[in-house]
Amino acid sequence: MKTFLTEQQIKVLVLRAKGLKQSEIAKILKTTRANVSILEKRALEKIEKAKNTLLLWEQINSKVNVNVKAGEDIFSVPEKLFKKADEAGVKVPYSTAEIIAFLVEHAPIENRLAKRDFVIFLDSKNRLRISDCLINLDEIEKK
């Protein structure tokens, strides 16, 4: 299987998942603890990038997405989402209360206000998702 991780990085992650310390892994792999630390750090960075890439792919293929600006009251978001969904002919399988509860749990908000810009979108499986990647799909489609 193709992966972004090297064989050594996979070994380190497997052994860490089993609860081994970096020094113990270093002995098993016949290397230094510092090298194990670097391998683990780079592996986790690659995993984070892969997760972000998949989230971006979901956003690109989203049925409906709404940009939320820093300082915006999240109570206005469900109405915007429903309006965009109506325009796209998509049924949102969530109530206003469910959308707000999702935002409270997953979005960068404080006291009902967005702390920074983000996107809420309905993915291809009708799941609500949050992304920090503010791509304007409407603008791209016009070009």
Swiss-Prot record:
**Record-annotated disulphide pairs:** none
One Gene Ontology term from the biological process aspect of the record: DNA-templated transcription initiation
UniProt cross-references to Pfam families, sorted A to Z: Sigma70_r4, TFX_C
A Gene Ontology molecular function term of the record: DNA-binding transcription factor activity
The domain of life for this entry's organism is Archaea
Q: Which UniProt keywords apply?
A: DNA-binding, Transcription, Transcription regulation
Alphabetized InterPro entries for the sequence: RNA_pol_sigma70_r4, Tfx_C, Tfx_DNA-bd_arc, Tfx_DNA-bd_euryarc, Tfx_DNA-bd_sf_arc
Q: In which family does this protein belong, per the annotation?
A: Belongs to the Tfx family.
Instruction: Describe the task this protein carries out.
Output: Putative transcriptional regulator.
What name appears for this protein in its UniProt entry?
Answer: Putative transcriptional regulatory protein PH0763
Query: What species is this protein from?
Result: Pyrococcus horikoshii (strain ATCC 700860 / DSM 12428 / JCM 9974 / NBRC 100139 / OT-3)
Upper classification of the source organism reads: Archaea, Methanobacteriati, Methanobacteriota, Thermococci, Thermococcales
